Amino acid sequence: MAPASSNPGPYSLPDKDEVQLSAEDDWTRVKDRKEKKRIQNRVAQRSYRSRMKARLGELQSRLQAHEEQKAKEEAERCDPSPPSPPSSSATGLHLHTTPPSGNNAGANDTEPSSINSASPPTPPDVVGDLDPSQHAKAIDQFSHQMDMAGNDDSQWFLDSTSLLQHGDTSSYIQPSVPTPPVSLSQCPPMPAYMPEGPRNPNDGPASLSQSILQDCLRFQIQLLAKINNPSEATSTTHKEEGSAAKSPGALQQSHWSSCATNPAAAAQNMMPSTNMARGNSFSVLPADFHNLDDMMELTSTGDLPNATWRPSQQFSGPETTPRSHNAENPTQQQSPINDDTPSTTQHGAVPDCYNAFVAKSSAQASSLGMEERLEAAIEGLEALGFTSVDSFAEAYYSSSFDESSHLAAEQSMSRKRRLPRMLSQILDSAQSWDPWDRRGLNEEVLRTAESLLVAEGKSMDEKSLEASISGLMQATEGSSKPTPPQQNVTGMKRVLQNELPNLWPVMMALAGGNRASRQRDRSNMVLAAILILHCSSKMTKQKLLEFLDVCL
């Protein structure tokens, strides 16, 4: 049983003395260690979700209060009644905590040291038109409060590391609020402050709410990154502050252009995938392989050390096109913050977290050899759900696609042209393999050839063959010469070639190895062998011997 604490973590277990647990949630009755941890994980997750729902409800109510206050002030400005004395809320930004302390002191006089660790700092309430300097000052004060709360190990900021103490993360449900990455290298660069530019007077409460939520998400991510990696966070913060002091407008335009209209989608993009939580970096298939056949041919050859990396120009990360599209059409990507969907796009699209792998591959393009390229390709296929390269090739050639799609046309072209050439190169390369390695391949080739020849023999037109044999025998009996006319033998060979298009060339290849001086025409020997296979049970022994004597 987890020890009780006055300041529990995000995933701590509830106190049994304060909460009445059901029989199925009481882990003290279970003796098995794994089952006990499973129950504790379930109870901790349920407690965490309930706290987060309450927190989200509180934030939603506060946002609604901000919107109502803004609408009320706009209505008062439009009212021609005598102006009332300006209130303290209309002169600047107010910083307050939730729940409020007992006194009614001004929010601007709130000290960072007076923040209670049980209640998180909240973003400033923008209730008036302020210049950028005042807004930046308020934001810096709020950032300092966030740092103080982080040093006190506040329970309001998510930390995924404490969850790992209760078991495997694969069985956990994704929280309703996206968990920020544990390192600054996994999240996009963020400015130290974002000055508020001149707003359009026509902007309503919706844009105000998005701005508040945007600042809140940004400071939470920075604080978590600083807690998990203090050295990296300090160096990155200094760099960001210097760049923001030089050109804050450029930083705001470059990074927040797409997030300003859709903060919920931006928060979802920052959430790491399950593979990142397990410690596996996500990777994708390098685009240097122009098709599947090229990659399969490279895996079958032995010239891996001599090959070099050739980065393809057609590969580009998905950050440019989808994000610019989202900026133009923000309504198509709007989603609630408490959505439990994983951080992957629809229609089988690759998640955004593979940009790190793309950057790493591009940076090391000159030093990567063929083995590194193939390893990266295999890692990318495994990350996309394929167990191996073989399963990917099997799915590519055996799947049925829409006839109008580009993939169907590419698959058809590969089946007709590239697949036979690839199989031929693999079989040629197999001659240099170890005997135990190529044994299975040779056996499979023989089984395939056997089934193909058997099916061909069953589908042969026996009536046409019998008619040709009867005509040949009648011509032999009616002729004074011991051998039948040449045109009859040639006609029978043509019939067998049409009926047995695979067996005839195989028999011709086998007969080519026997170069006896008395056998001038190998086709006659092949004709006799095929007739023995297919006609030995349909004629008497005397007839068969006479026919063989005619052919040979």
Curated annotation (Swiss-Prot):
Residues 56-63 are annotated as: Leucine-zipper. It comes from the Eukaryota. Residues 64-79 have a biased composition (Basic and acidic residues). GO terms for molecular function: DNA binding; DNA-binding transcription factor activity. Residues 31-76 form the bZIP domain. It is found in: Nucleus. InterPro entries: bZIP_sf, Sec_Metab_Biosynth_Reg. Residues 1-132, 169-209, 232-258, 297-349 are annotated as: Disordered. One of its GO terms (cellular component) is nucleus. Residues 31-55 are annotated as: Basic motif. PANTHER family: B-ZIP TRANSCRIPTION FACTOR (EUROFUNG) (PTHR39607:SF1), XANTHOCILLIN BIOSYNTHESIS CLUSTER TRANSCRIPTION FACTOR XANC-RELATED (PTHR39607). Belongs to the bZIP family. Transcription factor that regulates the expression of the gene cluster that mediates the biosynthesis of the lipopeptide antibiotics leucinostatins that show extensive biological activities, including antimalarial, antiviral, antibacterial, antifungal, and antitumor activities, as well as phytotoxic. All 20 genes in the cluster are up-regulated to some extent by lcsF, with the exception of lcsL and lcsP, which are down-regulated. This is Transcription factor lcsF.
